[in-house]
Structures are given as structure tokens and as C-alpha cells.
Amino acid sequence: MPRLPRALRFGPNMEVLSDFQELWYPESIIDSDVKYPLYTFRGSIGGSFFDSYGTNNIVREIRRTPHCATVPIASSGLRPCTSVWYDPTSLLFRIPEMRAEWDNGMGDAGDIVYKDFLFSTPAPKEFDFSNSLAPRYSNAFSAFNAKYGVIIGEGHETLKYFALLLRRLHKAVRAVRHGDLRGLRKILDSYNKGRWKPATAGNLWLEFRYGLTPLFHDIKSVMDDWNRINDKIQKLRRFSVGHGEDFKLSIDGLYPGLTHFRLSGEITVQRRHRWGITYANREGYATFDNGSIRPVSDWKELANAFINPGEVAWELTPYSFIVDWFINVGDIIEQQKQWYQNIDIVDGYQRRDIRMRSVSLKGVRNGIPVRVTGSVELVDSFYNRSHTTRIPQATLAIDTSFSSIKHVMDSISLITQRIKR
């Protein structure tokens, strides 16, 4: 019998199958091979030429998985998701070629070219962006586009607001048609009880953002629900979302071969998190259950998920949208209590990795800046992909940064509104 590559096995009819135990739970191996043990530097200092080398004193240790082969699954024709990781103790960088030039006077002039110089930084691999991914899963697999519980809860105020908009629009059209600028001014002044003040612009912005825009979205969502074709064909689909954020690493105290010459700078890396699943639609509806989608048939549980009283209560709480800027309460309530499409997740993965975005290098010679040109490449990065059949779950987190210019404008409008009072 021929020997198969790692992670493959023979089936009962001698067909070649994937060994899922090996693919999903592989054993690690430690890689500590030395790369680029030496670096070279050549050039001149003070008129003296030299050609020398130095030792890259880097301790390299990577915990990684061995290469595994896969074959497509007969029932779907898709290759299975596998667990793979490449986990170094630190990020390893290489300067393929760098040139340092200076002329500080008093005979202190130099022109040096370095090749294959290595340095390392701590690996910022403890990150998880599930809170950014979870809302996108909630939206993608929600049974309905519209939030009917919230629409019902806000129904009375919505009708009053809609009637007010129609009256204002009718009066404004009449004023423009008849060239009545004074009448149009009165309509605008009605936002602030007769006099135009700076706060009026803020009132108009808030009314547009949290009155008119959600109303149009609700109308569109209801229409989408009515027009949706409920496709329950038993075929596999794929879905994935990702999120990335920049992270800055400082470089300092690097002395490549020469005394009184120091390298420093900053490297920007991007930490990325992606979550993907392979699934099939099933009949019925479901709810969220600790990272999984659980089918539901009990009418009381279905009614509770349809109305989602927790989300309704939160949406009707004054200024809850401001809390959601900083604490993801709304995302958690929406994910855990809403009504989902019933799907069967047959395969999936979550992947975290680090990529280099940009680098800036600076040189210092005897306390004086030195012109440095060259490139940097990432030799050992971080990569972790693990098999899963769950979906990302939102957990309580605090975010003190404004995520968009709209939040800044909302804040200015609210502040001017409070000052006016």
C-alpha cells in the first residue's frame, strides 16, 4: 500500500480521504533554524575604506504546524478548512540593503552600505476583533431586515414625526412655488420657535440623523422583507468578514557594526482578523446560543425573538445611541436576542495574522542625525488559522475613539443644544 502525505488516509473502498483529526488538531513543531547569520557593511569613514561583517545575534524560535495535504470532500466538492499556525516568539525583520551617509565636519564623514542586517521586535499577537465582526454576522443572518419590535415600540412617535415632515414639506413647496421667502424663513425658524439661532443647525442635523434617516431605513427594510425570496435550496454557501487595525512598533538602540552609530525608527504593522463559515440554509428560524445558531420551534421563544424586547427597551432609552458610541451594549443585545435564519454551519475558520504596512528609519552619529536610505522586510510574521463551526460573539468592550466624522458632528450638535437650554 502506498504511503500517503500527512493528513490523508485511505477510506473503506481505498479512496483517499482527509484526516480531519490531523487537519483540525495538528501537532506543533519548533523551528529554530538560523537565517542570515551574518551581515556585511562596507564603505568609508574619515577617508579610510573597509569591508567587514558582523553577527546577527538573533534567537529565533517559531512554533508552527507541518504542511498537511487535503482532498475535496465528496459531498460538496470543497476542500476542508484546516488549522494552521506560524507563531514566532518575536517579529523578525531584515534590512536587505541600507545606506548611511553623514558629514559632521572635523573629519567625521562616512558613507556605509549594510546588507542582511536583522533585528526583532515584540510580537503584538494578543488581539481579537470579534466585536467588530459579530454585528456583521448578525446583520447577514438576521431573519428580517427590519426591527419590527422597535418599529412597533416607536410607532406612535414615528407617525407623529412623519405627519410633521409632510406638513413642513407641503408648506415649503408652496412657499418656494410662490416665491415667498419670508414664509420659507418662518418654516425654518419653526425648528427653533421663531428665531434662527446657531443651535438650529444642530437640531436639523440630529433630526436628519436620528429621525429621518432611520425612518427611511425602516421603510426600505420592510420592503426588502416583503420582496425577499426565501431560498431554501440545500446548497452550500460561503460567508466571511474581516477587520484590521494598525499597530505601531518602536525601533531603538540598534548598533549595526559601528560604535557611535545608532539606528531607530518606527514600523507600522496591520493586525487582521477574519472569520468565515461554510453553511447551508435550512427550513425554519433560529436564535443565537453562545456562538452557535440554534433552531427554534417553540412559539413563545419565536415571539420573544421577533419582538426582541431587550433591544426595544434599549432603543427607546434616551441617548442610548451615545452609550453605543463607547460601549457596545446595542450590538450585544441585538446579537443575542434577535430572530435568525436557520442555517447549518458545516465548516469554518477564524484567522488572525500580522502584515507590515510601512517603516521609517533614522540614524544618529555622535548625537547628530544621519541620512539613512533602505528598505525593511518582515521575515517572521504571525499567522494563526483555527477550524471552527461557530460565529463571532460580541462581548462588552469600551471604545474611547470616535469612529467617524458623524459622531463628531453629533457631539457638536448635542453640545450646542445643551448650551442653548
From Swiss-Prot:
Function text: Induces host cell lysis. Inhibits host MurA activity thereby blocking the synthesis of murein precursors necessary for the host cell wall biosynthesis. May be responsible for the attachment to the host pilus.
Picking any one GO molecular function of the record gives: RNA binding
| Cited Pfam families | Phage_mat-A
Q: Where in the cell is it found?
A: Virion
Q: Gene Ontology cellular component? A: virion component
Instruction: Supply the name of the protein.
Output: Maturation protein A2
| UniProt entry keywords in alphabetical sequence | Cytolysis, Host cell lysis by virus, Host-virus interaction, RNA-binding, Viral attachment to host adhesion receptor, Viral attachment to host cell, Viral attachment to host cell pilus, Viral release from host cell, Virion, Virus entry into host cell
UniProt lists the family membership as follows: Belongs to the Leviviricetes maturation protein family.
State the residue spans of region: RNA-binding. Answer: 159-177, 227-237, 295-299
Encoding gene per record: A
Superkingdom classification of source: Viruses
Q: What does the subunit section of this Swiss-Prot or TrEMBL entry state? A: Interacts with host MurA; this interaction inhibits the first step in host cell wall synthesis. Interacts with the capsid protein dimers.
A single GO BP? killing of cells of another organism
